[in-house]
Amino acid sequence: CKQSCSFGPFTFVCDGNTK
C-alpha cells in the first residue's frame, strides 16, 4: 500500500519499504 511520507522540505510516496 502507499502512504504519504514527509521528508524534510520534500514530500514523497512510500511504497512498503521502498521510499
From Swiss-Prot:
GO terms for molecular function: signaling receptor binding. Its main location: secreted. GO terms for biological process: defense response to bacterium; killing of cells of another organism. There is a cross-link at S4-C14 (Lanthionine (Ser-Cys)). Keywords: Antibiotic, Antimicrobial, Bacteriocin, Hydroxylation, Lantibiotic, Secreted, Thioether bond. There is a cross-link at S6-K19 (Lysinoalanine (Ser-Lys)). The modification (3R)-3-hydroxyaspartate is found at D15. Transmembrane segments: none annotated. There is a cross-link at C1-T18, C5-T11 (Beta-methyllanthionine (Cys-Thr)). It is found in: Secreted. One of its GO terms (cellular component) is extracellular region. Maturation of lantibiotics involves the enzymatic conversion of Thr, and Ser into dehydrated AA and the formation of thioether bonds with cysteine or the formation of dialkylamine bonds with lysine. This is followed by membrane translocation and cleavage of the modified precursor. Is a potent inhibitor of human phospholipase A2. Belongs to the type B lantibiotic family. This is Lantibiotic duramycin.
